[in-house]
């Protein structure tokens, strides 16, 4: 893991957690505990995900259970509970940073409320949206003192269109 080599004193490498995968909440908790035990800075980027079709095709090829949550509501629940988990750990003093990459207003509002109510250092929490989408969210977060990023999705048009259909 690159984070083992590079996250010794600051968050350099962020691990992306595709929250549409059933395994992601447990994987995130395990990785956070492992980083903390090793004295590393934990850095995570939470996304809902964009590779569902590929994941399902791979599961069928391997003859394993569908790795995707059964509904969008289950994916939302996994995303929001994992965001709360990381924010809670940060509020408890765990050396962690999280980027919440989402366009979902409810998820953002919940996270901002928790950061505010728990007195979490805003430098440990950042947000990201796709370039050209939901600019009003990005600007409002930035005006509120949060690190807020735009990211460009550079890939074949087929993949980009599939991603946009999920938003």
Question: In which residue ranges do the predicted regions lie?
Answer:
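Positively charged, amphipathic and often flexible ligand-engagement surfaces
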Residues: 1-167
